[in-house]
């Protein structure tokens, strides 16, 4: 009898640990973009401009990836090959420096422009968030679970989306 009680107690403890009741925030959007790189910011911005709700997930504290991380020299060769939102970015850089376009820039200028895309797009950015779990139905991702990059034992966030884009 004592053995049965002990087993039931252990099962109860293990089952409560396995389904620990972490505080969870649930967010539902049309498009979830994972990675706050240049591509990630522009993907979320474009989704919003096309009438879709979007959220951007960034593991760190800064947007823009290499573009805002110190790689501020564009060596495309033929600047006429650049179009669309990329051209818009370089023209915004140019405006900062009092020029029409600018292909060499400081990291803080690039980051400021990416933050402006976020503001103009009106989408949320979750900083310090990393992937904990992916949930699928068949081959399709239906939601992801995020944890705080600096405090993994804290609150988790569930993102439910119709589309997931990896820009990490």
Residue map of PLM features:
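Core beta-strand elements of the Rossmann-like FAD/NAD(P) dinucleotide-binding domain
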Residues: 27-29, 152-163
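Conserved beta-strand-loop-beta-strand element in the redox core of flavoprotein oxidoreductases
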Residues: 135-158
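Bacterial N-terminal signal peptides
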Residues: 7-17
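Boundary at the C-terminal end of the N-terminal hydrophobic targeting segment
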Residues: 20-23
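Beta1/beta-strand and adjacent pyrophosphate-binding region of the FAD-binding site
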Residues: 25-37
